Design a protein with these regions (language model features):
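Active-site pocket-lining/capping segments in soluble small-molecule metabolic enzymes
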Residues: 1-103, 112-254
Length: 254
C-alpha cells in the first residue's frame, strides 16, 4: 500500500522511513497552514507547495527546485506546471474542489503525473472517478479539510485591532461548526474540525498514494494513525463520504 504522509512533526521522520512511507515536506516560503516547514536541501522525498504564487514566486520556485534532490512535488498553482515541465520528477496537482469529476481529472492528467481527487465527494463518486481516471490518482484518507486561505494575516490583524495577545493558531466555532486557523507571515489558513476520515477507501486500485495529512497531531498519534490506522482519541468524521455535498437549497433533502 502506497501511503503518503505530510511531515507535520519532525520527530516522526525516522519512524515513518522505516515503514517505507513516502514523505511529503511543506516547502519553506512556498507553503502555508503548517507548524513545520523545510528548506529544499532538507527534502529527499516529495515537497508540498500550496500557497498563492506571484510571477516572481514561481521564478523563485523554479530556481529552488533546479538543483534539488526531490522525487516529486504536490502543488495547486497551475503556473507551476510550466515552471517544472523540464524536471524529471513526479508532478501531482491538487485541485481540491475542482477535481470532482473524471473528465476534469483526465484533462489535467495530460499535463501532470497524478491529481488529488476532491474530498467533497461520496465514496461511490470517488470510486467511480478512480475507475475512469487514465492515470493513478491520489486519495486523501485522513486530514483536516482546508476551508480557505488568505494572504492577509487575519489572526494577527484581529489581535492587533482589539489589543489582544497574539496567537498564531486559534480554535474557534460558529454555532456547531468548528475550525482551526493558522497564521504566519505568508497568510492565514482555515481548517474544518474534526478530522476528515476516509480510511475505508484504503486498498482501492488505480491509486498512486493514500494521503495522510496529520496536522496538529503529536508523534504517537501520527505513528499509530499512519502505521496501524489507529484513530483512537482523534475526533473524526466522514463528512461527505457518506452523504452528498449540499450545493444549493434544493439539495438539502437530496
Amino acid at each position: 500500500m502506497n501511503k503518503l504522509v505530510t511531515v507535520t512533526n519532525k520527530e516522526v521522520i525516522s519512524s515513518l522511513k522505516k515503514e517505507n512511507v513516502t514523505l511529503l515536506y511543506p516547502l519553506q516560503f512556498f507553503c502555508v497552514g503548517y507548524e513545520t516547514y523545510f528548506n529544499i536541501d532538507e527534502i529527499d522525498d516529495y515537497c508540498l507547495v500550496n500557497r498563492i504564487l506571484t510571477d516572481e514566486d514561481i521564478e523563485k520556485l523554479k530556481e529552488t527546485l533546479s538543483d534539488s534532490h526531490i522525487k516529486g512535488i504536490f502543488f495547486d498553482d497551475l503556473g507551476v506546471i510550466d515552471a517544472i515541465k523540464d524536471l524529471n520528477i513526479k508532478k501531482v496537482l491538487i485541485l481540491d474542489h475542482i477535481a470532482a469529476n473524471y473528465r476534469s481529472i483526465n484533462y489535467y492528467l495530460d499535463y501532470v503525473d497524478s491529481i488529488v481527487v476532491s474530498s467533497d465527494l461520496t465514496k461511490d463518486e470517488i470510486e467511480n472517478i478512480i475507475s475512469l481516471a487514465k492515470k493513478e490518482v491520489v486519495i486523501s484518507v485522513f486530514s483536516l479539510k482546508g476551508l480557505m486561505y488568505s494572504r492577509r494575516n487575519l489572526i494577527k490583524n484581529y489581535h492587533t485591532y482589539y489589543k489582544l495577545p497574539n496567537e498564531n493558531i486559534i480554535n474557534a466555532s460558529i454555532e456547531n461548526k468548528h475550525f482551526i486557523a493558522v497564521d504566519d507571515e505568508l497568510g492565514t489558513k482555515f481548517y474544518a474540525y474534526p478530522y476528515y476520515n476516509a480510511l475505508e477507501l484504503l486498498n482501492l486500485e488505480n491509486v498512486l498514494f493514500y494521503w495522510y495529512n496529520p496536522i496538529f497531531l503529536d508523534k504517537d498519534k501520527i505513528i499509530k494513525l499512519v502505521i496501524h490506522n489507529d484513530i483512537t482519541n482523534i475526533p473524526n468524521d466522514k463528512l461527505f463520504l457518506d452523504k452528498k455535498t449540499i450545493y444549493k437549497v434544493g439539495d438539502i433533502n437530496a
